[in-house]
Amino acid sequence: MDAVQTPIQAIRSAVEMFVFACFVNDAIGTNRITLNNFNQQTKLEDDGKGLVIKHGFTDAQLKADGRNLVLMALASTALATDKSMDVVYGDKYPDDTSELGSARAIMYQIRCAFAHDLLVPIWIPKPKYKHTYRVTVNVRRESGTTTPRTIELDMSTLGGKHLSIADFGNFGGYFGLLEYCFQKVQSDPKGNTAYPLPVEE
């Protein structure tokens, strides 16, 4: 596994994995990846003897796993982006409803929703985050152009509800939010600083 070295690389790697998951899911859905592509076992190599995993899939399981792969990869983009923004900008301030503050708060709440349940994400904002956050992002079109889209979340109304991609502008809005955050990280010198290792408490 390649080590992530900077906040910029962290976001890029997570987005790359999300895009990869989308392509895999599409290939499964269009039968370009089928049960015939899989062996009945695989081996995870490590410094020891490795681990052999034996498993058989059904067609329904394969399709469900493809969709879940996309969902989990999306969660990883929120986690990587939230942490990268923390590395570059420091602690978040829930009362900050500026565009940057809103982008950070929205990304953090998406991250937290997945943390509560990875496959069934739920909004559970803390009271201090129950503000309305608003940020305008650029959504890419097939033509190569972009159009502005405003993402607005009133966190006081979302508590306990299942997260829906429509809550933050669908996939176009979410990719626009990722791009907004990435550009902020990329434009700051700290975006190229060493990505901190976890600290034991």
Where are these predicted regions, by residue range?
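Short, contiguous, well-structured surface segments enriched in hydrophobic/aromatic residues
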Residues: 26-102
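Amphipathic, Lys/Arg-enriched alpha-helical patches that create a basic surface
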Residues: 13, 17-30, 73-88, 131-201
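N-terminal, charge-rich interaction modules
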Residues: 1-41
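Short, structured coil/loop segments at alpha-helix boundaries
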Residues: 2-5, 97-104, 170
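Histidine-centered, metal-coordinating catalytic motifs and their short helical/loop contexts
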Residues: 101-126
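Intrinsic-disorder/low-complexity coil detector
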Residues: 93, 120, 124, 147, ...
